[in-house]
């Protein structure tokens, strides 16, 4: 985007100075106004905006907490916090050891046992144990959060990191694009994870007509990952159901194999004669509605934003934020703004050209 700034004109500057002097002579200047009329506003950024606010569950590092999509850094900080917690446990054990008064010296009476006392006070031992327990428990909570199959904070951090790259910024590899957004609060994170767990429970239920198990059975009826026969529902939560139905990795592997077989079958049978040479006749048949590849029951969505379902407003908002059509349009659009100055000399030049044009026409007529 280019902006043309006209050069200053000496005549305009002189007129402006005359107007300023006339206005100053007519109107007295108030004594309280010490700044000039063309003062520049200085923007002072908020210092709090430069402090990272990455979310965490059990880490104690505060602003040093890495971004949620920086998994190696998160694992490193979790391990460091766990090691520090173990160090407090070791320190408490050292303080709780018993030692004899005056050290291990030879007692005058061998039958008398030496008097033992603790190395440190009880309050130091209790404080070390509490601190070590808090650090170890916090690192365990953070590890559970990082190992979840679905983490809203991870998706949020990754989304805004991509947005920062699109805008031409280079986000920090450790802290992420923390200047672009404020992370969601813990309550919103809990609600999103709870909704995800409920959806997973619905997908793995065999009684649900639109479940994930029926989809896999349609793609491969001979699959041994999900049992086709009805089984008595055993007591237990989602982990027990996942264990009975099969792991997601096994289901994905089986679906991938079934899709590969279907593609090979289509390429060798129905789409065997589909080449670039007969592309024009095939397109004509498709436009005329006479092709065998047309599904009359297929209803095309009015808005297509990738291979994602948009059954409700939340899913539509998620897809819209992921694809960012307005941001892509802004990046693909180029702006060129030109400012043409207007001054008194331009009108005089135009009048001179109009006056000279009849003379040139007469000269050309005489020459012909």
UniProtKB/Swiss-Prot annotation:
<comment type="subunit">
    <text>Component of the mitochondrial inner membrane i-AAA protease complex.</text>
</comment>
<feature type="topological domain" description="Mitochondrial intermembrane">
    <location>
        <begin position="142"/>
        <end position="368"/>
    </location>
</feature>
<comment type="similarity">
    <text>Belongs to the MGR1 family.</text>
</comment>
<feature type="transmembrane region" description="Helical">
    <location>
        <begin position="125"/>
        <end position="141"/>
    </location>
</feature>
<feature type="compositionally biased region" description="Basic and acidic residues">
    <location>
        <begin position="9"/>
        <end position="20"/>
    </location>
</feature>
<keyword id="KW-0472">Membrane</keyword>
<keyword id="KW-0496">Mitochondrion</keyword>
<protein>
    <recommendedName>
        <fullName>Mitochondrial inner membrane i-AAA protease complex subunit MGR1</fullName>
    </recommendedName>
</protein>
<feature type="region of interest" description="Disordered">
    <location>
        <begin position="1"/>
        <end position="49"/>
    </location>
</feature>
<keyword id="KW-0999">Mitochondrion inner membrane</keyword>
<feature type="topological domain" description="Mitochondrial matrix">
    <location>
        <begin position="90"/>
        <end position="124"/>
    </location>
</feature>
<keyword id="KW-0812">Transmembrane</keyword>
<dbReference type="Pfam" id="PF08602">
    <property type="entry name" value="Mgr1"/>
</dbReference>
<feature type="topological domain" description="Mitochondrial intermembrane">
    <location>
        <begin position="1"/>
        <end position="72"/>
    </location>
</feature>
<dbReference type="GO" id="GO:0005743">
    <property type="term" value="C:mitochondrial inner membrane"/>
</dbReference>
<keyword id="KW-1133">Transmembrane helix</keyword>
<dbReference type="InterPro" id="IPR013911">
    <property type="entry name" value="i-AAA_Mgr1"/>
</dbReference>
<feature type="transmembrane region" description="Helical">
    <location>
        <begin position="73"/>
        <end position="89"/>
    </location>
</feature>
<comment type="function">
    <text>Component of the mitochondrial inner membrane i-AAA protease complex required for mitochondrial inner membrane protein turnover.</text>
</comment>
